[in-house]
Amino acid sequence: MEQRVLKTLEYDKIVALLIDKASCTYGKEKASELIPFLRLDEVINAQQGTEQAATVLRLKGSVPLGGIRDIRGPVQRARLNAMLAPMELLDIASTVMAGRRLKTFLLDMCDDHELPLLQQQAERIEGLRELETEIRRCVDENGDILDSASLELRQVRQEIRQLESRIREKLDQMTRSSTYQKMLMENIVTIRGDRFVIPVKQEYRSVFGGIVHDQSASGATLFIEPEVIVEMNNKLRELRLREEREVERILYVLTEQVSFAVEALVENTEALTELDFMFAKAQLAWSMKAICPRINDRGYVNMRKARHPLIPREVVVPVDVELGGEYQAIVVTGPNTGGKTVSLKTIGLLSLMTMAGLHIPAEEESEMTVFSSIFADIGDEQSIEQSLSTFSSHMTNIIQILAKMDDKSLVLFDELGAGTDPTEGAALAMSIIDHVIDSGARLVATTHYSELKAYAYDRPEVINASVEFDVQTLRPTYRLLIGVPGRSNAFAIARRLGLPEHIIDVARGSISEEDNQVESMIASLERNRKSAEADRLAAKAARQEAEELRTQLEEERAQFAEEKNKRMERAEDEARIAVQLAKEEAETIIRELREMMAEGMEIKEHRLIDAKKRLGNAVLELEKEKVKKPAKAVRATQIKVGDEVMVTSFGQKGTVLEKVNNEEFLVQIGIMKMKVKRDDMHVQNSIQQKPQAAPYTSVKRRSDNIKMDLDLRGYNVEDSIREIDQFLDDALLAGLHSVSIIHGHGTGVLRKGVHEYLRSHRNVKSFRLGGQGEGGVGATIAELK
């Protein structure tokens, strides 16, 4: 891509915006080198990288890119075993940690989302935790080597501190001494040339003694090292040299460790460069409200509500452009008001951005193509008195474009043919457009020559376009109108500015009838377009209103369904509670009767009537709380005396004893006899197939919890009889036909007592000792009636 074209279309300004979005030096450098790709696969890959990074920003809002330093220089020096400075080591540690943090962040995102390009780069980053830990163990945030870096360093620094303390103590004694105070300029201890000194007045030089290391600017003060601390200062100097050697040794060790990780650091650097660059593109897209366009290599462009990215969003006017489908060229006609050039640059710049892997400010579903090259001849016409040199300059550029273009090129001409005689200029413009079309290239050209309006109508590959102009404000609206040629609007503008009407009429009369017809036709087209646009907007508004109404109805329907479900759940909960209460009431009745029987009490008639009444009330409560009755397996007219039936409200089996009337039957349920409505039961032995499932509320059968055997081992005879009596009642209510009573071998007393009780029990049909696998003589099997 020619650099002149990139500059003409202001691509360099887009790159500057991209550089500003990068977080580190690596990303900024890569952004500065970005040029459009020329291969479809490269463009698609670059766009996918931008889209995946944009997805992360949409989901997370930000990305941990802080802490990345430019470590390429230190890494290369470490490769050569050149000692690294502490701050360089800190930069390496910071970058290692930043890379590891970014890797963890991205791989966590990749667990939930498809982000293959980001994942590929993240997986290149090596953690290098040991290297970072070792650097931070030895170097603090200010770049100083820590005492913990080595035992030798800790020891020598401790000696230095102790010796410095002794020296200061010695000098403090001198400054406080009355003998020396009159000789001192100030009672302080200071350092000159790494040696402790005190300020002495010039006149006491010979009296004070010692070594002079410095003097004040006036010469009145001498900084003297007293003789009593010379040896101590010498020792201090030796210790500091030891410290320097140890620090240097530590830095060499750390540098060596960096050299071992050079390849990994280079790989990390490259991965961080790619990631920072991708997120810079995503940040730019976010700031522009840009989208990822569809990409093709057919030369087809369909921009929807495309905006020039360098014009503020609050003032830019979107344009719709379709090129390369039905039409190969667009000729934008009309007066040179400036709006045409903006449209031309928008088409060119967005094409460059697409090919560079950048998202474009347009609506979703916009489609762009990959051009082999983009050429542009764009220059503002300053006046009607353009010089021949300007025309020659443009023509030289056009000649070069025509020589280089091919069938996959995009050619942009601004004010084609301007700067020369209008008749000749228009003829040249039409001939140049013909040549570009014949080459197969895509073309967008602007012109103010009216001759090209009719030309565009005559060529099926070419379509007219214009930039809308508001005659009232005398300003272009910058809306690109495809299919509508531009009008000069000269008469309308003159009238608006106050030119006398008779002058305008004379001017209009001097124009040929054909030109007047063309202008009238264009005016008619413009009126029809505005009418169609108004209808389209009205239809769009109606469609949007209908869509909003549909969405509202869907939401209301969903809310209604949710509320209905909640009410059903509440009803079912209430029914379950009522069922449980009714069940407990029924069990209480049965338990009371059982206790009365166990105590040998005669059950009076009024007691039995009261129990039946209470049980009947419980059944009625169950029936009231049913959500839905199950399908009847057999019609009520088919129920007859002797049938085994399932009583729905209790979930219990029973036997029909007699038919009371057409609505009720007398049913034996365990030890109880009760009236049951015909709709509350069905014949158990007549069900041939499972009825259609229907939700209903029922009592939970006791057989869900009752056991088939009763273990009496350890009980006496009296307690055993009470347990057997309750066990048999539960078994009968559960519909069991036989049970096992375990009494053990023992002395036989318990077995004998069990047998005597079973023999007299009214609901025991027969009993026997258990066989093999049934407990033998230690168990008794009872058959129930």
From Swiss-Prot:
InterPro entries assigned to the protein according to its UniProt record, in alphabetical order: DNA_mismatch_repair_MutS_C, DNA_mismatch_repair_MutS_core, DNA_mismatch_repair_MutS_sf, MSSS, MutS, MutS2, P-loop_NTPase, Smr_dom
EC number: 3.1.-.-, 3.6.4.-
GO MF, any single term: ribosomal large subunit binding
Gene3D superfamilies (alphabetical): 3.30.1370.110, P-loop containing nucleotide triphosphate hydrolases
Signal peptide: none
Segments forming a coiled coil: none
Full protein name: Endonuclease MutS2
Highest classification ranks of the organism: Bacteria, Bacillati, Bacillota, Bacilli, Bacillales
Gene, per the UniProt record: mutS2
